[in-house]
Design a protein with these regions (language model features):
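Soluble oligomerization/assembly scaffold segments of membrane-associated complexes
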Residues: 1-169
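Extended, helix-rich structural scaffolds rather than catalytic motifs
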Residues: 170-184
């Protein structure tokens, strides 16, 4: 039986990053998922000043708003979530979807746990003193590591990860500011 870890990565242009971010977050929640990361920022590309009078200057700022978002949704809702997110796309840079079958990794971890338990019971039967304690501790540590690895894989199977990089067209902000150099 296959057990897939499904992931999606998208980069696209939107009309308004802030509005699209809220839409993506709302869609994620409605699908039973959650946001694990978001980094909404504005990057200034140019600032210019134009004198409009002896005491006033027009400051023009050119900037780009972008956001990197990571969400997790139930595996069964990945396709629906991607379709709902796509309504925000003005231009798609790329979309990558991957599915990694981890059934053999889970089997290997389960077998490691069984071997460790069998080894511990054999050592307990022979009761070899202090060296047995070290061996049992080592075996238990291996079993614990395998169990934790399976839990992590199970979580990744149940919840797909979607990484989004969104941006919008460059924006302008104009502001009339005081020209302090000419004020006496």
């Amino acid at each position: 039986i296959h057990q897939f870890i499904r992931k999606a990565e998208l980069k696209f242009k939107v009309k308004n990053v802030v509005n699209s971010t809220y839409d993506i977050e709302t869609t994620t929640l409605k699908m039973g998922g959650f946001v694990t990361y978001t980094n909404l920022s504005s990057s200034i590309s140019k600032v210019s000043h134009t004198a409009v009078s002896s005491d006033s200057t027009l400051e023009t700022t050119e900037y780009v708003v972008s956001n990197s978002i990571t969400v997790r949704v139930p595996n069964t809702k990945l396709d629906t979530t991607l379709m709902l997110i796509s309504r925000n796309i003005e231009f798609l840079d790329y979309r990558i979807i991957s599915a990694d079958d981890v059934a053999l990794k889970i089997l290997a971890n389960t077998l490691t746990q069984k071997r460790a338990k069998m080894g511990m019971s054999r050592i307990n039967q022979n009761n070899n003193g202090n060296s047995a304690v070290d061996i049992i501790t080592n075996l238990q540590s291996r079993a614990d590591d395998a169990m934790i690895a399976n839990l992590a894989l199970s979580d990744q199977i149940q919840y797909s990860t979607i990484q989004l990089s969104i941006y919008q067209r460059e924006s302008l902000k104009r502001e009339l500011i005081a020209n302090n150099q000419n004020i006496k």
